């Protein structure tokens, strides 16, 4: 009898622990202008079932991109607002899903669209002004004044969109010794050496790579093993594969996310890799509004597997949940998040019928409940 009770207790404890591991905070950044959202939203999300529940909201102007620091205690947001653009810092209580505003700093550029953070710094990509700003952090997680501002000055062939530099992304290299910077306006990727304690010279340019003229480099991701990088180009649907070694990129494949018979408007947006490194996903806005699935080969190259409608308009951002079971797509123009079931064997996605109704959802971050 005692043994039976003991086994039941162990089973109950195990099931409770598994349930807790499946409970996450889903933090969503939005556009508030134009739009009908208020700022940053936190949802409870269960990775076993894809069940969700609205929890809290923190008011903020156009927090279109978010970064959670390594401790999971602080969240940083861009506030995309033209010449009035700022960067905001929040503390985060993961146990209850609550953000608390700490402070903000001028973005040192116009329309920040991406940022990354570590224990020491927050690095921001300012799109319209074509600059990079590096901010420090104090012990409370608040932002200090900018330590370094780097201005790009180039251009490219598209006279409507590439008259000047437009920094679209900053990303740490896998070893965090470099920062990769995509400049849509220059058709160029910059590779900066990163020394987080170097005062006003935290970023020092090491190399740059020219991309196909008129293609517009947007987002880049690394394979889980850090050996390959994948660049999505916004303006023509191109997708470029690189090998990566110690701050240097070498091109090994050119492909695209556009269907052969597609004749509409292209607006490549987001790119993600499954945690097992087997599949790559890329979204296209414009008149396509779809996601293309690629299988990743051992040599890093891609094979196109399938293409699916995202069931909305403007799939600016999407995310694969921590379990790998679900893929969530945010629609900027139809104001919802569509939840797909992801086949972890084939990579294919299918609609679950689940929807989060939310104005212009454009960034997603998962943080475990504590």
Predicted features, each with a name:
Residues 97-169:
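Asp-box/WD-like beta-propeller blade repeats and closely related beta-sheet repeat scaffolds
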Residues 53-119:
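Blade-loop segments of beta-propeller domains
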Residues 43-50, 90-97, 135-144, 192-201, ...:
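Short loop/turn segments immediately following beta-strands, especially the blade-tip
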Residues 36, 60-70, 108-119, 153-176, ...:
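Beta-rich, blade/repeat-based domains predominating
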Residues 1-24:
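Bacterial Sec-dependent N-terminal signal peptides
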Residues 53-58, 100-106, 154-161, 204-210, ...:
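A short beta-strand motif characteristic of beta-propeller blades
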Residues 31-33, 80-82, 127-129, 137, ...:
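Short loop/turn segments immediately following the C-termini of beta-strands
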